[in-house]
Structure formats: structure tokens, C-alpha cells
């Protein structure tokens, strides 16, 4: 479609082009253009840099238009599918929606873990580049890097107050970082014989648990840095350790296709969960708020009455997500939909939904009550490796092999 400019607009555009040619040293072109466009040799100051300003404005507007179009497509889809629209959704129904609010770059290798700070508006990313980076998730600003590991940082975890950060690495060490003032490493613990793949604080904050490729889980005293307990039982690499909020039990998952739930105060395995057909990559404890949705979903499959829990979700290389009642060692439901390994899980604080990250490059939102995938976000250019859901603010973060960390707003 031909755009029609008024005489004045045409003259101003010609002046701006002449200014651009002159200021960038295109003398011959400028002379020819002045003759053909009848532009005076005395360029006014107001035309200085005007063409560049207009060009950058167009690019900014184009980006805004694309974002609005994505949101409009999203809204139209919801109307067609009959999902509650934004005005009708309560905060308990808010889920991550495209496009991402921020795409954060700075790491020089794959992202291995992303987590929110429990109190401040900060998030932390760990990477195979051996660094940990701190970001402000509300502004998308980079804050600082924590350096000290000499190999891939595999996992990070905060204590309940967010005063200490624990990290573990393929360099066989676990480090504790002061997250209040100095942001320096205050302790380094050694004891594992192979890659340390996961780390978690117990709720009281006085102990840290670590899981390793050496097939063991170790408990470390924060005050002294000493290993006080070693749990054995897995037959292969222990991928992840996660502590239940009450602090009396914790769960681990492994390349041996099993999940084990352990008693914190002894070295005993309370229950072994078997049903996955491949390596179990990730686990997540369900909040109390999820109990009713899980029970309702399980009701169709299990005619055994009300399940007490606690409930645990697991994601595997067999592409499935399973929800377990660990008190009886029973798999209550299986969620199918991912086309590749499931690498990360996080429950919605309201308990209705579970979000998952996968090597199929997507984030999926699962409606637990109806046992279905209600939204798929094509999140990254490469495998999605980690995901976290903020407990108080409407944000989800994801990390990927594409070296980016993305912040998703929930609405």
C-alpha cells in the first residue's frame, strides 16, 4: 500500500535524509540527492539525527505491537477454549502466559538451576559456566555474580530466611554463601567422591543435604561444615534431593529409576517409589493447598478413599510426571504430554496447578484436578532445564541450555 505524505512531511523527510547523508560522510550521494530533491544546503539543527531517532522509534513500536499481538492471540484462544478470562480469574488461578516479561542473558553456558529468593525481589541462576548470577526479577536487572566453583554449578538452595545460599558443583564441593552483606563464600565442604548434583536446606536452617553421582546423600552441619550423616541405598547417580516443609522427611530421585523417601533423624529409607521406566530427573513436594485437587484427580483411578499425603511429584526421562502419596507408596496419577525428558517441576502456591520444564523446549501448566495440560508455553530455543514458581508474587522463572533465564508473569 502506497503511503501518501503531505508536502511538508516530504520536505522534512528529505531534510532528515540529507542530514543523515552529510553527517555520515556520503558527500557524492548528498550532492546528487540535494539536486534531485531540491533540498537547501543549509540544514536546520532540528533535523540533526532525526532519521536515526525515527528508525529506533519504529523498531520500539514494532516490538510493542508484536507483544500486544501475542497477548491478543492468547486472549482469543482463551475465549474459544472457554477458559476464565483475566478479569474472572482469581490470583489462585493465575498461570504463566506468553510472551516472557524478561529474557536475561549473561551466562556463557547452559543454565542448570533457577530459584527465587524467599523474601527479596531477587532470583538466582546457576550455570555450567561455574558461576552463580543474581538478578532482580521485577526489573530484569543483573545484580552480581558469585564465583568460586571451578566446574559446573549443579544446584542452588536458600535457607528459609534467605540469609544463606548453598551451591553444589561438579568440582565435588558444596559451598555456603553469605547472602546478607558480603555475598562471599563462608564455607566449602568436601566429602563426595563424584559430581554433587543437588543441595537442599532443612527447614530449621542448621543442616544442608547434598546428593551425588557417588550414589550417596550426605547431611552437613552449617555451623561447622562437618558431614554428620551419610544415607545409602540408591544404586545409581542421585539426581535431586528435596526436603518436606515439616522437616522430618526428605525425598531423593535417581538414575536407578526410583524415588526414595527418607527419615531425617535416622538413616532409614521410609519408602521406595517405583513406576518410572527411566532416570527420574526431578521431584517437588506438593503444598498442603494441592491436597484437595490431587485427591479429586485420584478419585477416578483409586477407589480407596481419601489420601492423607504428603504428596510428591516426580519428572522422568520416560517423559511422564507422576504424583505420589508417600505415606502409602502409591502412584495416584500420571501426567502425559511432554515429548522429551521432564527436567523441572514446581507447584502453584494455590495448589491447583503444577508447572513442568522439559527437553522438548516447553513449559507446561497442568490442571491437577482434571489431570490435563491446560497450557503449553514454547519457552526456549533449547532444552528447558529448570523452573520455579514464586510463593507470593505472580512470577515463574525458567532456565535453559540456550543460556537464557526467562521471567514469566502470571495473569
UniProtKB/Swiss-Prot annotation:
GO cellular component terms given for this protein: axon cytoplasm; cell cortex; dendrite; dynactin complex; dynein complex; growth cone; kinetochore; kinetochore microtubule
SMART domains to which the protein is assigned, alphabetical: LisH, WD40
Coiled coil: 56-83
SUPFAM superfamilies listed in its UniProt record: Lissencephaly-1 protein (Lis-1, PAF-AH alpha) N-terminal domain, WD40 repeat-like
WD repeats: 106-147, 148-187, 191-230, 233-272, 275-334, 337-376, 379-411
Pfam families assigned to the protein according to its UniProt record, in alphabetical order: LisH_PAC1, WD40
KW Coiled coil (keyword) present: yes
GO biological process: border follicle cell migration; centrosome localization; centrosome separation; chorion-containing eggshell pattern formation; clathrin-dependent endocytosis involved in vitellogenesis; dendrite morphogenesis; establishment of mitotic spindle orientation; germarium-derived cystoblast division
Subcellular location: Cytoplasm, Cytoskeleton; Cytoplasm, Cytoskeleton, Microtubule organizing center, Centrosome
Molecular function in Gene Ontology: dynein complex binding
Keyword Transit peptide among record annotations: no
Domain LisH: 9-41
HAMAP family (UniProt xref): lis1
Family from the record: Belongs to the WD repeat LIS1/nudF family.
Protein known as: Lissencephaly-1 homolog
Amino acid at each position: 500500500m502506497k503511503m501518501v505524505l503531505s508536502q511538508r512531511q516530504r520536505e522534512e523527510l528529505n531534510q532528515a535524509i540529507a542530514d543523515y547523508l552529510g553527517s555520515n560522510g556520503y558527500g557524492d550521494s548528498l550532492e546528487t540527492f540535494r539536486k534531485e530533491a531540491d533540498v537547501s544546503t543549509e540544514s536546520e539543527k532540528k533535523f540533526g539525527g532525526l532519521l536515526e531517532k525515527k528508525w529506533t522509534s519504529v523498531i520500539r513500536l514494532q516490538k510493542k505491537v508484536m507483544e500486544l499481538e501475542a497477548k491478543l492471540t492468547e486472549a482469543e484462544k482463551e475465549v474459544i477454549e472457554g477458559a476464565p478470562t483475566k478479569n474472572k480469574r482469581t490470583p489462585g488461578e493465575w498461570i504463566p502466559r506468553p510472551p516472557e516479561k524478561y529474557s536475561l542473558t549473561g551466562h556463557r553456558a547452559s543454565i542448570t538451576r533457577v530459584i527465587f529468593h524467599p523474601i527479596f525481589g531477587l532470583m538466582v541462576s546457576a550455570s555450567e559456566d561455574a558461576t552463580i548470577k543474581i538478578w532482580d526479577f521485577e526489573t530484569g536487572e543483573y545484580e552480581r555474580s558469585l564465583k568460586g566453583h571451578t566446574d559446573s554449578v549443579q544446584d542452588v538452595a536458600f535457607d528459609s530466611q534467605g540469609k544463606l545460599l548453598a551451591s553444589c558443583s561438579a568440582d565435588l564441593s558444596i559451598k555456603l554463601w553469605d547472602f546478607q552483606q558480603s555475598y562471599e563464600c563462608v564455607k566449602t565442604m568436601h566429602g563426595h567422591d563424584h559430581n554433587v548434583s543437588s543441595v537442599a536446606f532443612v527447614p530449621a536452617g542448621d543442616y544442608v543435604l547434598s546428593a551425588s553421582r557417588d550414589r550417596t546423600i550426605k547431611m552437613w552441619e552449617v555451623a561447622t561444615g562437618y558431614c554428620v550423616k551419610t544415607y545409602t541405598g540408591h544404586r545409581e547417580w542421585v539426581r535431586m534431593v528435596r526436603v518436606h516443609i515439616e522437616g522430618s522427611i526428605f525425598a531423593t530421585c535417581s538414575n536407578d529409576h526410583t524415588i526414595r523417601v527418607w527419615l531425617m533423624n535416622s538413616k532409614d529409607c521410609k519408602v521406595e517409589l517405583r513406576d518410572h521406566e527411566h532416570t527420574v530427573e526431578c521431584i517437588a513436594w506438593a503444598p498442603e493447598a494441592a491436597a484437595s485437587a490431587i485427591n479429586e484427580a485420584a478419585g477416578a483411578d483409586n477407589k480407596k478413599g481419601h489420601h492423607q499425603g504428603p504428596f510428591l511429584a516426580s519428572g522422568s526421562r520416560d517423559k511422564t510426571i507422576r504424583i505420589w502419596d508417600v505415606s502409602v507408596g502409591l502412584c495416584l496419577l500420571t501426567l502425559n504430554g511432554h515429548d522429551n525428558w521432564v527436567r523441572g517441576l514446581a507447584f502453584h502456591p494455590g495448589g491447583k496447578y503444577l508447572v513442568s520444564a522439559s527437553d522438548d523446549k516447553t513449559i507446561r501448566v497442568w490442571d491437577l484436578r482434571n489431570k490435563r495440560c491446560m497450557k503449553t508455553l514454547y519457552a526456549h530455543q533449547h532444552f528447558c532445564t529448570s523452573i520455579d514458581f514464586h510463593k507470593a508474587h505472580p512470577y515463574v522463572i525458567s532456565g535453559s541450555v540456550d543460556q537464557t533465564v526467562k521471567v514469566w508473569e502470571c495473569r
